[in-house]
Amino acid sequence: MTAFLIRPDMPGFKVVGTVHKLGIRGSTQAELSYEALEVPVDHLLGAVGRGFGVAVHVLNAGRLTLAAGCTGGTKRTLNQMASYAEQRVQFGHPLADFEITQRKLSRIASEIYASDSMLGILASLVDRGDNDFSLEAACAKVFASEMVWRAADEMVQLAGGRGYVKPYPYERILRDSRINRIFEGANEVLRLFIALNGVQAPAEALKEVGSALRRPLRNLGLLSGYATSRVKLRLGQTSTLDIELHDRLRKHKEYFEQHVAELGSATDRLIIRHREQIVDSQLMLERLADMAIDLFATASVIARTQSLIDERGIETCEREIALCDLFCVEAGRRFRANRGMLDSREEEVDNTRRGVAGFVREGKGYFVTDAILEE
């Protein structure tokens, strides 16, 4: 793969026509045609055959900025939700008085706080010249793009019929938010990227251990090192947050470190169970990715909250601590749910899913016929 530049005035290049889109209609997309187009050598970006690296670098930056844009968009949506919930009265009360509305507002606020925290970590990596932030950027992009979509959906739901019609702005927010889960790499692909990067190192380590077990007397060092790391992992003594935390945050740190250990051991079990077929076990990889995303978000939230406490004092950080508490609890619940679905028993359910999908493919759609309903 080779990267190169194309100018609109180059012979053989043509814009076929613009594309009419569901949302983001303020920007123009078009179909492009290349016919017998010759690219001069000085139009190359990097060396021949090195275009993939250029693409990855561009995508990393794009995922970072897209996550930032989604976070800003979610803040604006939450502002509109808060305003509407106070103004709209039902049953003698503003919508903001009802617990279901409060759950919507609080979840979105805590997720904004988490997304902002992840972006802070990412920005610091960029500022210090760290070029390898592809995993963190992918995590932030997936998290933020799904957050902004949920917020847009909740805004439309909160507004009721007004959310579905013009001239109210809510239907446009929904339309404009949808593309973010596709831009800069579809979220399904990014989840596989996150998970496969996560299993690569453990898989290599397990291969080394497997080779060492064939000649144990010659490889005592490797085996003992691996055994020690596994024991520490079981005890939750690896991947700790090496920062001093206020007492209000320590419970979150303890759960975080426990969950990191559980993710590591769960990854090992999956590799042992599936071996080379792990790359095709997309549902299991998707769960691993979601666990990793929630762990990255949790670590970012804890670190940011402690930084604010250090800077401003505990007395002025009650709202931020509440956001931290809420996000860590809900992220922990999602983590444990996904961890439970890594069990071999879930594979039976996954097999059923594959079977039903096969029936859909064979029937070219819904496949159940019922004589009573057809009459």
Regions flagged by a language model, labelled:
Residues 15-18, 43, 54, 84, ...:
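A residue-level detector for conformationally permissive "hinge/kink" positions
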Residues 45-65, 78-110, 120-138, 162-167, ...:
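Glycine-rich cofactor-pocket loops
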Residues 71, 75-78, 105-119, 144-155, ...:
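Alpha-helical transition-metal enzyme core signature, strongest for iron centers
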Residues 8, 78-89, 112-129, 148-151, ...:
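A generic secondary-structure signal for well-formed alpha-helical elements
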Residues 24, 131-229, 233, 319, ...:
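Alpha-helix capping/hinge segments and adjacent helical runs
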Residues 1-75, 90, 182, 186-269, ...:
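FAD-binding core of flavoproteins
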Residues 15-31, 78-79, 85-86, 91-96, ...:
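A broadly tuned preference for mixed-charge, low-complexity surface segments
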Residues 221-375:
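C-terminal amphipathic alpha-helical interaction region
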